[in-house]
C-alpha cells in the first residue's frame, strides 16, 4: 500500500542533483573543519597558508593574465591571507585544466587552415573597423565575412518560430550547442524536429553544458538522445567531487543548420527564454540569425569543440556548402569565440575596442556588471570625452547578490557621465553592444568575470550591417520601459557600503 509513495520519495531524494549537492556540501564542510582545526593554535600552518597566498600573489604579478582578473585575486589574497591562496588554486587558476586545454588546442591547431582571413572580405572598412576585424582574425583566429545576411531578434519568442522553420528545412546537418537545455515547451518543439530529422538521416549533434542543464534534464537524457540517433556530449560533466576544472563552463549558444544558417545570442533552450514561463517578470533577451558564408565560422567552432571530446572527423570540407550564386551585400559579419584556456581575452578586448573607437554613442545590454578597473576606466573615459554611453541592466534580478554587486559599480560610472537604466518589466538577459551606427556585437558574453575569463563564449561582430540599426532601434525602444538611475539613487548606509565592498572583493568568485 505504501510502496509507490516510498519509491517516489526515494527516487526524489536520491536523484543526481541531490547526491551531487549533498556530497559537495559534505566535502566543503570537511574542508572547513580541517581548515579551522589545522589553523587554530598552529602557527606553522597559518604561516604556511600565508606563504601560499604570498607566492600566489607573486605568481599572478608575473603571469601573463588580464590585469583586472589579477588585481581582483591579489586583493582577495591580501584581505584573506589564510584562505586567499587556496581559493585561487581552487577557483581562479586555469592551469589545472591541462587535459581540457590540450584537447582543444590540438583540434584548433589542426584546423587553423579552415579559417583564414581573405583580404577582399574586409575591403571597404575604415581604419578603426579594420583594426577591430584584424584583431579577431589574428588573435581570435576568426575571419570576417561578406556575403552574409543577418537578422536581429529583440526577444526569444520572436526568434523561436524562425528557428523551428529553419530546423524543419535541414537536409544535411544540425549542430546544437547550449549552456542550458531544460525540458518544456521550447525544448519539446526543438527535440521533436531533431528526432524527426535524425530519423531521416540528417547528422544531428548536441552539446550542452552539464552544470547549466543539471536542473532541467532527466538523468537518462544522453541515452534517450543516442537512441534517437542524436549524438550528444554533456560538456564538463558535474561530478560530486570538488574539482578545479568545474569553473570552465560552455556558456555558448549556437545552432548551425546545413553549414549555411547559424544562430547565437543570449537565448538558451528553456521556457523562460521565450516567455512561456514567467520567472522574473518579462524575460528580455536577444538573438542573431546569420545566413551565408559567415556560418562556416560557427561550423568550425562547433566541430572543433565536438572533435576535442568525441573525435569523429579530421576533414571538415564535407560540411562546407558551396558559395552562394546570389551574394549578399550587407557589410561585414564576423563570428568569434573566446576560451578561458589561453591568455588572450578576446571577448573583453572586443568590448574595449568598441569603446575606444566610439565617437557618438555606445549602448550596452548586460544582465550583470562585475568588471575590473580596465573596463570601468574605458566606460568612464568614453563618457568623459563626450560619447553617449548607456548601460541597460535588469530591473528584476535573477541573483540578488550579483544584482547588488552590479549596482555597486553605478556611482563612479554615473559621476563620469555614463547613463544607467534598469529594465522595469522584468529580467534583461541580452548581451549586446551597439556603437555609432557602425558596429554591434550580439552574443553570449556577459560583463562579468565568469564570462570574460572563465567560460567558453561566442559572439558576432557586425560592421556596416543593416542589423546594427535594428539593435540600436531596439535599445531606443526599450529605454522608455526602463527606470533611469541617478546619483541620488546610489546613496547607501554604512553597512550597505561595507557589504558592497565585500561583494566587489569577492567578484572574481561570483
Which role fits each region the language model picked out?
Residues 361:
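Phosphate-/nucleic-acid-contacting segments
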Residues 420-424:
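Active-site donor-binding acidic/aromatic loop of nucleotide-activated sugar
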Residues 431:
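Catalytic-core elements of nucleic-acid end-processing and repair enzymes
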Residues 179, 368, 402:
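Glycine- and other small-residue-rich loops at beta-strand/loop junctions that grip anionic moieties
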Residues 350-354, 374-388, 405-408, 414:
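Exposed, interaction-prone extracellular/peripheral surfaces
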Residues 1-349, 353, 357, 397, ...:
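N-terminal localization/anchoring segments of enzymes in phospholipid and broader phosphate metabolism
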Amino acid at each position: 500500500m505504501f510502496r509507490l509513495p516510498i519509491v517516489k520519495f526515494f527516487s526524489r531524494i536520491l536523484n543526481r542533483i541531490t547526491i551531487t549537492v549533498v556530497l559537495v556540501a559534505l566535502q566543503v564542510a570537511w574542508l572547513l573543519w580541517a581548515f579551522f582545526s589545522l589553523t587554530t593554535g598552529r602557527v606553522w600552518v597559518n604561516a604556511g597558508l600565508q606563504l601560499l597566498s604570498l607566492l600566489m600573489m607573486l605568481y599572478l604579478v608575473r603571469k601573463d593574465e588580464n590585469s583586472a582578473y589579477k588585481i581582483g585575486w591579489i586583493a582577495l589574497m591580501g584581505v584573506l591571507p589564510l584562505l586567499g591562496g587556496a581559493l585561487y588554486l581552487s577557483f581562479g587558476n586555469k592551469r589545472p585544466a591541462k587535459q581540457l586545454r590540450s584537447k582543444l588546442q590540438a583540434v584548433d591547431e589542426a584546423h587553423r587552415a579552415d579559417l583564414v582571413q581573405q583580404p577582399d572580405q574586409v575591403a571597404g572598412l575604415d581604419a578603426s573597423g579594420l583594426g577591430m576585424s584584424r584583431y579577431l582574425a589574428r588573435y581570435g583566429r576568426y575571419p570576417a565575412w561578406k556575403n552574409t545576411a543577418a537578422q536581429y531578434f529583440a526577444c526569444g519568442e520572436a526568434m523561436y518560430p524562425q528557428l523551428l522553420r529553419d530546423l524543419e528545412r535541414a537536409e544535411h546537418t544540425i549542430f546544437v550547442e547550449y549552456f542550458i537545455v531544460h525540458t518544456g515547451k521550447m525544448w519539446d518543439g526543438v527535440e521533436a524536429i531533431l528526432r524527426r530529422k535524425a530519423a531521416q538521416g540528417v547528422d544531428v549533434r548536441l552539446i550542452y553544458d552539464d552544470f547549466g542543464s543539471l536542473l532541467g534534464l532527466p538523468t537518462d537524457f544522453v541515452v534517450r538522445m543516442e537512441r534517437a540517433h542524436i549524438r550528444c556530449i554533456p560538456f564538463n560533466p558535474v561530478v560530486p567531487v570538488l574539482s578545479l576544472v568545474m569553473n570552465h563552463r560552455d556558456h555558448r549558444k549556437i545552432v548551425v543548420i546545413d553549414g549555411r544558417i547559424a544562430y547565437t545570442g543570449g537565448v538558451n533552450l528553456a521556457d523562460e527564454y521565450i516567455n512561456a514561463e514567467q520567472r522574473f517578470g518579462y524575460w528580455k533577451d536577444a538573438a542573431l540569425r546569420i545566413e551565408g558564408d559567415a556560418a562556416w565560422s560557427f561550423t568550425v567552432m562547433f566541430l572543433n569543440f565536438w572533435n576535442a571530446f568525441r573525435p569523429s572527423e579530421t576533414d571538415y570540407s564535407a560540411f562546407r556548402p558551396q558559395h552562394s550564386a546570389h551574394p549578399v551585400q550587407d557589410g561585414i559579419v564576423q563570428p568569434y569565440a573566446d576560451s578561458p584556456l589561453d591568455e588572450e581575452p578576446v571577448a573583453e578586448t572586443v568590448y574595449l575596442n568598441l569603446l575606444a573607437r566610439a565617437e557618438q554613442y555606445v549602448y550596452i545590454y548586460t544582465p550583470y556588471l562585475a568588471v575590473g578597473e580596465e573596463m570601468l576606466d574605458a566606460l568612464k573615459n568614453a563618457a568623459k570625452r563626450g560619447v553617449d554611453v548607456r548601460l541597460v541592466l535588469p530591473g528584476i534580478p535573477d541573483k540578488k547578490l550579483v544584482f547588488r554587486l552590479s549596482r555597486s559599480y553605478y556611482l563612479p560610472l554615473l559621476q563620469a557621465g555614463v547613463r544607467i537604466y534598469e529594465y522595469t518589466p522584468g529580467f534583461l538577459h541580452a548581451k549586446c553592444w551597439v556603437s555609432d551606427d557602425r558596429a554591434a556585437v550580439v552574443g553570449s558574453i556577459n560583463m562579468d568575470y565568469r564570462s570574460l575569463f572563465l567560460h567558453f563564449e561566442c559572439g558576432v561582430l557586425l560592421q556596416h550591417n543593416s542589423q546594427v540599426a535594428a539593435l540600436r532601434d531596439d535599445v531606443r525602444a526599450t529605454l522608455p520601459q526602463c527606470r533611469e538611475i541617478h546619483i541620488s539613487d546610489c546613496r547607501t548606509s554604512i553597512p550597505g557600503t561595507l557589504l558592497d565592498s565585500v561583494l566587489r572583493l569577492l567578484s572574481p568568485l561570483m
